[in-house]
A protein has these predicted regions:
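Short substrate-entry loop that stabilizes the transition state in hydrolases
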Residues: 70-120, 192, 253-254
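Hydrophobic residues at beta-strand termini and immediately following loops
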Residues: 31, 50-52, 82, 111, ...
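Non-catalytic accessory segments flanking enzyme active sites
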Residues: 1-74, 88, 96-99, 103-104, ...
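Active-site-proximal cap/loop segments of hydrolase catalytic domains
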Residues: 110-300
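Conserved hydrophobic/aromatic pocket- or pore-lining residues that grip, position, or stack substrates
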Residues: 18, 52, 62, 80, ...
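Exposed loop/turn and edge beta-strand positions of beta-sandwich/beta-sheet ligand-binding modules
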Residues: 46, 58, 76, 153-155, ...
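Flexible loop residues that form catalytic
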Residues: 10, 23, 84, 162, ...
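Short hydrophobic segments within beta-strands
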Residues: 8, 65, 81-82, 160, ...
């Protein structure tokens, strides 16, 4: 038995802090605070939570970070990040890397779309299997709402997502390319239908609970076909897209991003460029070394 509860806290403007809370005296004691070697003045920044209305009336939480002197008249560039899969909730926590962009006038936004558990288990259930298209609609709705509220404007948004979030990037590139100046897709799962049909791939059967089994279920086949990024590339103008792959990647094999890039380059009617970067020594998580990982972030 103990009367002390230890917890941690951070926000998009506050580095991680660890506290002890005495449940008898109701006193809170700061035990440790994350040090930022380059320095950090939280008073220079604003973090907010707003909500965007999706196609079916659901309110999509969007977390924002920007400098206090950023003009909110639609002129600011905006980086919009999303994932929306496997029940993973995207925490609006502190990351020192973001401030390089924010200090240069960017608004940084995280769309807490369906497929995660940001609003509970129902939020996850309504973004998987036959409900997967909600994930993409939510992200597009968040982007449009940010334009309507003058945090940015169409053509000033860069979208960012990796793995299943890379699938999100591919889907929104097909469905609403006019919204984005650029898209960054890290190890993107973009050939969804072919991968889910190939049960010889060791990671395919465990994934059927998330996406459906198109080889055994016609409804799952049609749903996946409706959004699979590779299968829905068409002759239209695309934003600039940076695609990153890893040669030793066991989850999203390197040829998936490569064939997607080839299809985009073949069919697109304008826009781009479409750039493929393959790390010859990296897997699903990107570069392993601390400094190499920082180079990955800087490249993006």
């Amino acid at each position: 038995d103990t009367k002390i509860l230890r917890f941690s806290y951070s926000s998009m403007t506050t580095p991680r802090e660890i506290y002890d809370y005495d449940m008898d005296t109701r006193m809170r004691i700061l035990r440790k605070r994350q040090e930022i070697p380059s320095g950090h003045d939280a008073s220079r920044y604003v973090t907010r939570r707003i909500f965007a209305r999706s196609h079916d009336g659901e309110d999509i939480p969007v977390s924002l970070l920007y400098a206090k002197d950023t003009p909110l008249d639609g002129s600011a560039p905006l980086l919009l990040q999303g994932y929306g899969a496997y029940g993973h909730a995207g925490p609006a926590s502190f990351s020192a890397h973001r401030f390089s962009l924010v200090d240069r006038g960017f608004v940084y936004a995280i769309a807490h779309i369906r497929g995660g558990t940001d609003k509970g288990w129902r939020w996850y259930e309504n973004g998987k299997l036959e409900h997967k298209p909600n994930t993409f609609a939510d992200f597009i709705s968040a982007a449009r709402h940010l334009c309507q509220e003058k945090f940015t404007r169409e053509g000033r948004i860069v979208a960012l997502g990796g793995s299943a979030g890379g699938m999100l990037m591919g889907a929104v590139a097909n469905q609403a390319p006019e919204l984005f100046a650029g898209i960054i897709a890290d190890v993107p799962f973009v050939d969804v239908l072919n991968t889910m049909l190939d049960e010889q791939l060791p990671l395919t059967p465990p994934e059927w609970v998330e996406w459906g089994n198109p080889g055994a279920d016609e409804k799952a086949f049609k749903t996946i076909l409706s959004y699979s990024p590779y299968d829905n590339v068409r002759a239209q103008k695309y934003p600039a897209i940076l695609v990153e792959a890893g040669l030793t990647e066991p989850r999203v094999t390197y040829w998936e991003p490569a064939k997607w890039v080839a299809r985009l380059r073949e069919l697109m009617s304008g826009g781009g460029p479409i750039i493929l970067y393959t790390n010859m020594d990296a897997g699903h998580g990107g570069a392993a070394g601390r400094f190499d990982a920082l180079k990955d972030i800087a490249r993006e």
